[in-house]
């Protein structure tokens, strides 16, 4: 399985190239300023960790003879860094988020697709994420961030 950027509500981001979104929310919840290392219009695919686990469990249950491919892309939602910022500001009014692109890291992200085609996984083993962008923020990520920081 080829995963998009995986986000867990229960672990802290660890400085990965796709961690700018979660880093924004953690900073906003702590009333800390955050300078995002990619451009505001940067868009890539993300997925909630429970959906990543679900995909692995689904795939392992498919009889081998029913699979026509060796590699499957899976996707959940694609969002820009600016949209992450907007969600952070909406959830934590007064959040101080700016954009200060790092050329090296921006170059890495620019080499990735904005979204991925997971049609093979959807067709061959009925892949479908539980978390779209709204459910990810409203039902998974933000409740845990608020709980972690007492907000």
Q: Language model features by range: what are they?
A:
Residues 1-43, 49-51:
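NAD(P)-dependent short-chain dehydrogenase/reductase
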